[in-house]
Amino acid sequence: MLTRPELKNQSLAMLRGKWTQPVVAALIVTLVSAFTQGGSQTQSATFITLGFLVMLLVAMNLQYGFSVGMLRFHRGRENTVNEMFSAAFKEDYGRVLGLMLLGALFIFLWCLLLIIPGIIKAYAYSMAPYIAEDNPELDPIECLRRSEVLMYGHKMDLFILHLSYIGWILVGILTLGIGLLWVKPWMEMAQVKFYEELKAEAGNNPIQA
C-alpha cells in the first residue's frame, strides 16, 4: 500500500497539465448538488419538493459518474465530463440509481443510531462505485457488500487520507469555494489510487468473501 504522501503526490502528478476536464466535471457536480439545497420561496411546496427529489436523484447519479469518471481518467480515458455523464445516465441508469439510493438509505439508517456509525458505514461503502464499474454483472447490494469487505481494516486509513486535505479545503473555502473545484478531483484521484491499491492487495478480485 502506498503511503498517504505517495497517494497524494502521484494523484497530483497525474492531474498536472490535465485539470480542465476534472475541474469542469467537479463544477457540474457542485452546481447540481447546490441546486438541491435551494428553492424559490415563490413556488408551491409540492413543486419545490418534486424538483428537489428530481435534482437529488440527478445529483446522486452525477456523483457516481464523477467517481467513475476519475477512475477512467486514472486508466487513460481522460475526457472526464463525457465519461461522467456516460457512467451516470447512459450505460446502466437503473443500476447506478439503485446503488446510490441503497447506499444512502443504509447510511441514513445507521445515522439514526448515532452519527459515528453512519460515517463508518459511509466509508465502508466508499468503494462501491468503483466495484460497480469493474464488475458490471453485480447488482447494487453485492457492490455494497464487496465494498464493505474490501474496506475492512482500511476505513480509518481512508478517513485519515481525506483528513489530510483539510488545509487545502480551508484554502478552497477562502477563495469563495473556487479552489475546491481543484481539491475535489485531487481527492477523488487519491481515492481511486487507494482503491487500486486495495484491489491489488486483494489479488484484483474484490471480493468473494
What are these regions (language model features)?
Residues 1-209:
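Hydrophobic alpha-helical membrane segments
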